[in-house]
Design a protein with these regions (language model features):
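Gly/Ser/Thr/Pro-rich low-complexity, intrinsically disordered segments
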Residues: 1-182
Length: 182
């Protein structure tokens, strides 16, 4: 008798309908809420960010800017919307980026294809390059989302709330920035 092992490397999460926003405070009534930019050990956001059209660039990095506009996002060297943050680009216009980091971790990305934006999350630890390749198979653009110690996130679908990374649930109040949909 033959057995077939089907390996599912990533899970796709559809976003609720609504405007993507970014905040340095966790919104209490969001239908989707996911950590976004990297932070240091004291919770300071690493990189420039933008809230309600105002720039905060004290910790600017060389990473690309991820602008949130309506229900879509844009990866660019300049801000293209009222909300945004700096983060690693995994896929840009169907070109998969390569990384030298060989550490394996559970990974998450904000992605888009011709049908719109969605979240991809690895089902087990993988390198950043392997995760970028998986994203490249499923989307035209992808930006990494911080998982770190505080990688809790959720998407509400009616009465169902699905934690994206259960270990982060207990430290969710330590995260300092979020992508969300009200």
């Amino acid at each position: 008798m033959a057995y077939i092992h089907i390996e599912k490397r990533v899970t796709r999460f559809e976003l609720p309908v609504g405007e993507l926003k970014w905040s340095n405070k966790r919104p209490q009534n969001a239908r989707m809420c996911i950590p976004a930019a990297f932070t240091d050990g004291r919770g300071r956001i690493l990189g420039a960010y933008r809230i309600n059209g105002k720039n905060y660039e004290a910790n600017k990095t060389m990473r690309m800017k991820v602008s949130l506009k309506g229900d879509m996002f844009f990866i660019s060297s300049k801000w293209m919307g009222d909300y945004g943050f700096q983060q690693l680009t995994l896929v840009n216009d169907s070109k998969v980026m390569k990384f030298h980091d060989t550490r394996k971790s559970v990974r998450r990305a904000l992605c888009k294809d011709k049908d719109g934006a969605f979240i991809l999350q690895s089902n087990y630890p993988m390198t950043m390059s392997d995760f970028a390749l998986e994203c490249g198979k499923r989307c035209t653009n992808a930006t990494y989302l911080d998982m770190g110690e505080y990688g809790y996130g959720y998407i509400k679908n009616g009465f169902f709330t699905r934690p994206l990374y259960i270990w982060g649930y207990f430290s969710r109040d330590k995260q300092t920035n979020w992508i969300y949909i009200e």
